[in-house]
Regions:
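Structural preference for long, well-ordered alpha-helical segments within the folded cores
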Residues: 27-30, 82, 110
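A common structural junction motif
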Residues: 32-35, 86-91
Length: 135
């Protein structure tokens, strides 16, 4: 898999929403021993723990989702076509993002959000407003 400094190295990445991202990051790092890897404003952060990664996000108003999952894949468009053929509920089609990823999102029958992501470029987080703490 192509390396991208803007993304955690893990293949499966849980995303947990909180009302106060900074407070959650401080608590998770202090209490569980996570390390802050990347900060994006006050609304998103990536944390590391050994070989694992976790994304802390700002909770969306009216959101019923308690968590979501990001899965990194090698061939996003092929993966998307497979999912699309199964009549899954696609909430956003594949798109390229300034942080070097091509992603699409699906909602599963339980209402959980799954974002599938493929690295398309190694992007320095500074170029889009991120602060990288570890590489």
């Amino acid at each position: 898999m192509t390396k991208n400094r803007s993304m955690p190295p893990a293949v499966i990445i849980p995303e947990l929403p909180y009302r106060d991202v900074r407070e959650a990051v401080e608590w998770l790092c202090h209490t569980f021993g996570f390390t802050e890897r990347l900060r994006i404003g006050n609304h998103r952060a990536q944390l590391s723990f050994g070989e694992g990664s976790l994304v802390v996000t700002q909770i969306s108003a009216g959101s019923n989702t308690s968590f979501s999952v990001m899965v990194r894949v090698k061939e996003i468009d092929r993966h998307y076509e497979r999912v699309k053929a199964s009549d899954a509920q696609i909430t956003s089609p594949p798109a390229d993002y300034p942080y070097g990823e091509r992603q699409y999102t699906v909602q599963d029958p339980g209402g959980h959000r799954w974002t599938f992501s493929q690295t398309i470029a190694d992007i320095d987080p500074k170029t889009w407003g991120g602060i990288l703490f570890e590489d």
